Amino acid sequence: RFKKIRRLGALPGLTNKRPRSGSDLKNQLRSGKRSQYRIRLEEKQKLRFHYGLTERQLLKYVHIAGKAKGSTGQVLLQLLEMRLDNILFRLGMASTIPGARQLVNHRHILVNGRIVDIPSYRCKPRDIITTKDKQRSKALIQNSIASSPHEELPNHLTIDPFQYKGLVNQIIDSKWIGLKIN
């Protein structure tokens, strides 16, 4: 994980750690001239590792985004940002996207009152995301909300930390997308 961060730069969804400033110097010395192929490959790898996707999943999302109206890149980022695991991360219910995936896989999360155990579930506007009523589920979310740095919440999401409830208001705006891709 840390090799990926040193190579690609900060990936907030993968881990809370940041690369040291000295590693940038090493990369600059080693890099030389960056080819167009290398730039595209690094940007693709950033997407894969940040959102925790396999190559096949990413290709499916690119295919869906290509069919949709609008800029393929913007539609792709909107699709990835509207995944359930990413929304839990943005709400602060999990400290990282892999942590959010684990919450979903272990059936701690309800969407509109139903258990959802698929991290790639595509959330829609007006979806209500809550935790199970079990004490263990609420404790996991409470620890994450308490320990997470209180960053500004994107305007397409609202959270009620006392009821452990989040709401998807609308499809994400392009200015709120967390990962900067070239």
UniProtKB/Swiss-Prot annotation:
Establish whether keyword RNA-binding is in the entry: yes
Question: Which CDD domains does the UniProt entry name for this protein?
Answer: S4
Can you quote a single GO CC term?
small ribosomal subunit
Q: Where in the cell is it found?
A: Plastid, Chloroplast
GO terms for biological process, alphabetical: ribosomal small subunit biogenesis; translation
Keyword Plastid part of the UniProt annotation: yes
Q: Organism's domain of life? A: Eukaryota
Keywords assigned: Chloroplast, Plastid, Ribonucleoprotein, Ribosomal protein, RNA-binding, rRNA-binding
Which part of the chain is the S4 RNA-binding domain? Answer: 82-143
Please provide, alphabetically and separated by semicolons, the GO molecular function terms listed in this UniProt record.
rRNA binding; structural constituent of ribosome
Under PROSITE patterns, the record lists: RIBOSOMAL_S4, S4
A Pfam match: Ribosomal_S4
The record's principal subcellular location, in a coarse class, is: plastid
Q: What does this protein do?
A: One of the primary rRNA binding proteins, it binds directly to 16S rRNA where it nucleates assembly of the body of the 30S subunit.
**Subunit structure and binding partners:** Part of the 30S ribosomal subunit. Contacts protein S5. The interaction surface between S4 and S5 is involved in control of translational fidelity.
What family is this? Belongs to the universal ribosomal protein uS4 family.
Question: What name does the UniProt record give this protein?
Answer: Small ribosomal subunit protein uS4c
Organism of provenance? Libertia formosa
